[in-house]
Design a protein with these regions (language model features):
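Conserved alpha-helical scaffold segments that buttress catalytic/binding sites
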Residues: 1-148
Length: 148
């Protein structure tokens, strides 16, 4: 990884003290990073081995009682489910797994959500756009259910 590229934003934010590594978790990583930045990480392979429910329990356990901001990178999905991204990498999670995780975040005190890396020029059949819209919709539904 270069000193500054699309994959170093978290490293730079941590180095500048903008991210509390003890309160952070990254799920679904598939590329290797030499820098141990102190963030709890669950790779895509670990998710496949552990199962979606166990990973969700791990997420909830790690973040319970904290204020949570979710940043969802669409390329966590396997290119079969999200081909329209700038960095497709095989071995990602399925869209149903992403939806299960997003829906399962309901117990957390989430204050915001973003979804990034959708690239329409690479999304010829709008497969990625549909997945992204569904994920965002489900998160909005989770937030609405928290209000009631």
């Amino acid at each position: 990884m270069g000193e500054f590229d699309h994959g170093t934003m978290f490293l730079r934010a941590i180095q500048e003290g903008l991210i509390d590594t003890d309160s952070s978790i990254q799920v679904g990583l598939r590329t290797h990073n030499d820098a141990d930045v102190g963030i709890k990480q669950i790779t895509s392979q670990q998710l496949h081995e552990m199962g979606t429910k166990a990973v969700l329990e791990e997420i909830l356990s790690h973040l319970q009682g904290r204020i949570v901001y979710v940043s969802f990178d669409i390329d966590v999905l396997d290119p079969a489910f999200a081909p329209g991204t700038g960095t497709p990498v095989s071995g990602g999670i399925a869209s149903w797994q992403a939806l299960t995780i997003v829906q399962g975040l309901a117990p957390l005190n989430m204050v915001g959500f973003d979804l990034v890396e959708v690239s329409p020029p690479f999304d010829h059949a709008e497969i990625t756009a549909i997945a992204a819209a569904t994920i965002i919709y489900d998160w909005i539904c989770v937030k609405a259910s928290q209000k009631s």
